[in-house]
UniProtKB/Swiss-Prot annotation:
Keywords: Cell inner membrane, Cell membrane, Electron transport, Flavoprotein, FMN, Heme, Iron, Membrane, Metal-binding, Transmembrane, Transmembrane helix, Transport
Annotated GO CC locations: plasma membrane
Reported cofactor(s): FMN; heme b
Subunit structure: Heterodimer of a catalytic subunit (MsrP) and a heme-binding subunit (MsrQ).
Organism classification: Bacteria, Pseudomonadati, Pseudomonadota, Gammaproteobacteria, Pseudomonadales
Topology term for the membrane: Multi-pass membrane protein
Molecular function via GO: electron transfer activity; FMN binding; heme binding; metal ion binding; oxidoreductase activity, acting on diphenols and related substances as donors
Similarity annotation: Belongs to the MsrQ family.
Main location, first listed in the record: membrane
Listed GO biological process terms: protein repair
Protein name: Protein-methionine-sulfoxide reductase heme-binding subunit MsrQ
Job of this protein: Part of the MsrPQ system that repairs oxidized periplasmic proteins containing methionine sulfoxide residues (Met-O), using respiratory chain electrons. Thus protects these proteins from oxidative-stress damage caused by reactive species of oxygen and chlorine generated by the host defense mechanisms. MsrPQ is essential for the maintenance of envelope integrity under bleach stress, rescuing a wide series of structurally unrelated periplasmic proteins from methionine oxidation.
Keyword Kinase found: no
Keyword field contains Ion transport: no
Amino acid sequence: MRYWYLRLAVFLGALAVPAWWLYQAWIFALGPDPGKTLVDRLGLGALVLLLLTLAMTPLQKLSGWPGWIAVRRQLGLWCFTYVLLHLSAYCVFILGLDWGQLGIELSKRPYIIVGMLGFICLFLLAITSNRFAMRKLGSRWKKLHRLVYLILGLGLLHMLWVVRADLEEWTLYAVVGASLMLLRLPSIARRLPRLRTRPGVS
């Protein structure tokens, strides 16, 4: 397997972060409401992984190194895993597995609906992130996986709705996300490989 060391590093890193959070919860280091803290951190971790996934193609075009693409799918699947953990933690720590409370939560907090839409879209990408699905779907596979842009928008909207007045951190992620979208515009994406051939650009 090519770039096995890079894949291993991504695997260990993505696994270590939630494991560390669970350890912090175990030793009561997550504050007065560790359940909510875990929910928030898993959601933010999923957004970071989504941005990293979207950054792989521009990085490959800028550097010419194929290792970035080698871990793109892995990062995307870890993003889905974090979202799944985020949703599970919400059901356990916020809802207390009281499904009757879910209707009340949805009416009071519409951002949950936005988050669920993002999860459904991400689920579709996760189950089709394999060679069998690529062969079966053909040209439709690329069209389906453009849902990643919608997922980013939904994720940022979900976070904006949650943080409300505290916009400093949200703005940072929004700017990074918008920049990655700009780099994917055909007129800009075509120029990225040329940048590494210019003098002074390695």
